[in-house]
Design a protein with these regions (language model features):
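Short, aromatic- and glycine-rich surface loops/edge beta-strands on solvent-exposed regions
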Residues: 26-29, 72-88
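N-terminal "first-domain core" detector
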Residues: 1-37
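Beta-strand-rich interaction surfaces with strong enrichment in secreted/lumenal proteins
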Residues: 1, 42-46, 68-69
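Solvent-exposed serine/threonine-rich low-complexity stretches and specific carbohydrate-binding patches
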Residues: 37-53
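Short, surface-exposed beta-strand/loop "edge" segments at domain boundaries and coil↔beta transitions
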Residues: 35-39, 64-66, 87-92
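A structural detector for beta-sheet-dominated domains
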Residues: 14-16, 31, 60, 83, ...
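Short beta-strand elements
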Residues: 86-130
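Signal that preferentially marks extracellular ectodomain short beta-strand elements
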Residues: 55-75
Length: 130
């Protein structure tokens, strides 16, 4: 999974298979690979066919409201634990919740890298007339 900074992101997973609740909200636990920092947010499943896959909108922004599917993440790699909880819940603590999936995530900047073009090569062609 990939999250781009300062944009709306759709995270696709299969939480229905391991879940036990009907029409749950999902608690996302983001654990940064390099330092173990944990960040949480709640996502609402917006997929049309929840039996096949689940789709949650997660907005990456600087001043998030974690209970509205918003999160602030630094660039890098994360382990994401996804838990189900009762619809309408604003709980940001995974204790006692059912984990439905674990995924890897990369957070990257939305700015496109600058391509540098090299023009120092010879533009003449040598032809052998043998």
């Amino acid at each position: 999974m990939i999250i781009y900074k300062n944009t709306n992101n759709y995270l696709d997973f299969t939480g229905f298979e391991a879940g036990v609740l009907v029409n749950p909200n999902y608690l996302f636990e983001f654990i940064k690979d390099d330092d173990g920092t944990k960040t949480y947010c709640i996502g609402v499943d917006i997929s049309a066919n929840k039996v096949k896959h689940n789709l949650c909108l997660i907005v990456e922004k600087n001043s998030p409201i974690f209970t509205n599917g918003e999160v602030y993440l630094l660039q890098g790699f994360y382990l994401v634990n996804i838990y189900e909880q009762a619809n309408g819940s604003t709980n940001l603590d995974p204790t006692g919740l059912t984990k439905v999936e674990t995924k890897k995530l990369r957070v990257i900047d939305t700015a496109m890298p600058t391509n540098k073009e090299y023009n120092g090569y010879t533009k003449t062609q040598n032809v052998y007339n043998g």
